[in-house]
């Protein structure tokens, strides 16, 4: 039988090579991957942070595709992971006579962050085409002295073409566990399902096709006053947009939600929040990445 779906794997192991770049060390990596994953050229910023764009060469996902993405940060590593294009999930419902209900394309993300390491995972948006079925799972393990920043931007349908999600479904589960000497603690759990029902509901998305999440988990001993100051600055960012935004203070970090009609607005908002997080963490100011949409670069 001919297989019509992808089963792709990518494993990334980042570590500090102890080679000085002025007063900082440089994070490098080893990798192992199969199609459709392809790693683009990595670069470094002035803090030795490894900046790595990942490309999905197939151009999109269809029902039955399975991707496994594993990331490991050894001690004293700094990493910015992103993607070079939006992830497209094509329609599955009603396509096959054998399986008219369709099948989910799935991505499993396993992330392990060891002591004094910092991961920023900022992929571009996921577009769920009409009748697309997609499920993603994130399992993150993080030490008490490390941090994790993650953004997730979802567009339901191609609204410019008058398309909505129809019978499609987006599912996401994020689990973050904090490692310590005695036992592992649950740091954060988030589960989301978006469908036509949630898209049209007044108490849901109310026909706004773009939904975004930004999660930042900081070090266990990070200053609470700094977090409160960060929240005040983020609320000022909210005042400059006409979209729906909310923020929650976690035990160790923050959670931001975006709801609107423009992916560009969401990217701009999250970029500004990212700058504030870098600032409060004592890191260098982030730069707009060359693999991101060119039309955004002049507006940030």
From Swiss-Prot:
CC per GO annotation: cytoplasm
Any one GO MF annotation of this record: nickel cation binding
Residues of the signal peptide: none
InterPro entries: UreD
Main location group: cytoplasm
Keywords: Chaperone, Cytoplasm, Nickel insertion
Localization per Swiss-Prot or TrEMBL: Cytoplasm
Keyword Nucleus set for record: no
Family: Belongs to the UreD family.
Quaternary state and interactors: UreD, UreF and UreG form a complex that acts as a GTP-hydrolysis-dependent molecular chaperone, activating the urease apoprotein by helping to assemble the nickel containing metallocenter of UreC. The UreE protein probably delivers the nickel.
Task performed by this protein: Required for maturation of urease via the functional incorporation of the urease nickel metallocenter.
Protein name according to UniProt: Urease accessory protein UreD
Source organism (scientific name): Prochlorococcus marinus (strain AS9601)
Upper lineage: Bacteria, Bacillati, Cyanobacteriota, Cyanophyceae, Synechococcales
């Amino acid at each position: 039988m001919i297989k019509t779906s992808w089963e792709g794997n990518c494993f990334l192991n980042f570590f500090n090579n102890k080679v000085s770049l002025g007063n900082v060390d440089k994070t490098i990596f080893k990798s192992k991957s199969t199609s459709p994953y392809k790693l683009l050229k990595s670069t470094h910023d002035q803090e030795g942070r490894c900046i790595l764009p990942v490309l999905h060469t197939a151009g999109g996902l269809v029902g039955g595709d399975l991707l496994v993405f594993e990331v490991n940060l050894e001690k004293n590593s700094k990493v910015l992971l992103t993607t070079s294009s939006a992830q497209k999930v094509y329609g599955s419902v009603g396509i096959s006579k054998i399986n008219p209900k369709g099948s989910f394309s799935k991505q499993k993300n396993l992330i392990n962050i060891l002591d004094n390491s910092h991961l920023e995972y900022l992929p571009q948006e996921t577009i769920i085409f009409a009748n697309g079925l997609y499920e993603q799972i994130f399992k993150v393990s993080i030490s008490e002295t490390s941090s994790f920043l993650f953004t997730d931007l979802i567009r339901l349908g191609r609204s410019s073409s008058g398309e909505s999600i129809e019978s499609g479904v987006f599912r996401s589960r994020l689990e973050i566990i904090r490692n310590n000497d005695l036992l592992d603690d649950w740091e954060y759990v988030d589960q989301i399902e978006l469908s036509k029902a949630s898209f049209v509901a007044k108490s849901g998305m109310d026909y706004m096709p773009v939904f975004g999440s930004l999660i930042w988990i900081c070090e266990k001993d990070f200053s609470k006053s700094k977090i409160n100051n960060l929240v005040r600055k983020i609320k000022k960012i909210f005042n400059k947009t006409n979209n729906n935004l909310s923020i929650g203070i976690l035990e160790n970090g923050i959670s931001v939600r975006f709801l609107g009609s423009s992916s560009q607005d969401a990217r701009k908002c999250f970029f500004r929040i990212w700058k504030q997080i870098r600032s409060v963490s004592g890191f260098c100011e982030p730069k707009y990445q060359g693999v991101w949409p060119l039309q955004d670069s002049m507006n940030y």
